[in-house]
Amino acid sequence: MIEYLIVILASSLFGLQHSGLSSLRVKESIIDRWGKQGYSRIFTTTSIITLLIAFLSMNFWNWIYFITQPTLLQPVLFISGIILGLTGAIMAIMASRVISVSTVADMRTDRKAELVTDGIYSRIRHPLYLATILVLLAVILIYPFPIVAVFSLCLMTYTMIGAYFEERKLVRHYGDEYLQYKKNAGFILPKIR
């Protein structure tokens, strides 16, 4: 039981770090002191460290169980997980193609961020969050072990919480333009028109 609590606490640490450094007040304070590149380095480094801590907290080392212990393999779950993971990866690539130029450039220059509503963003406001959830669900299907499920469920929960806070930040930043966009595109699933 304690091992699950450790995973939950370590995953929560990642969530607090990620949301904390993403909050406008903290972000602006760091940018004022160390610039956009400094913020980017701090955010990336601390995100990697806290996610690595959460990952290692699982103390799970049987990543190739399907080779070393093939009797544990559940083909339907495994194949479903591969399909779900590939779907999530493709969705992440599609979303990144649309935002990568704008978002990455905005962090490295003084350009003002633009509201992206093209491509996959025309149907889903947060496709990267959906892609993350699909990949985490795939991990549960491919690795049907309780400790892996706890880790993935913690990160899925944080993803939804992060999407909620991101949504609030976008409404504040873009105002009516974003409120209009919300009418046309679904939160995390495509809006049926």
Language-model-detected regions and their locations in the chain:
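Cytosolic-biased juxtamembrane loops and peripheral soluble domains of multi-pass membrane proteins
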Residues: S23-Y39, I67-R193
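Alpha-helical transmembrane spans of integral membrane proteins, capturing the lipid-embedded, hydrophobic core
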Residues: V7-G15, I48, M156-T157
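A generic, lipid-embedded transmembrane alpha helix
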Residues: I42-N59
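Feature marks short, highly hydrophobic, charge-poor N-terminal signal-anchor/signal peptide-like helices
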Residues: M1-L5
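N-terminal signal-anchor/start-transfer transmembrane helix
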Residues: L9-K27
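Hydrophobic cores of alpha-helical transmembrane segments in multi-pass inner/ER membrane proteins
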Residues: L13, T50-A54, I83-M91
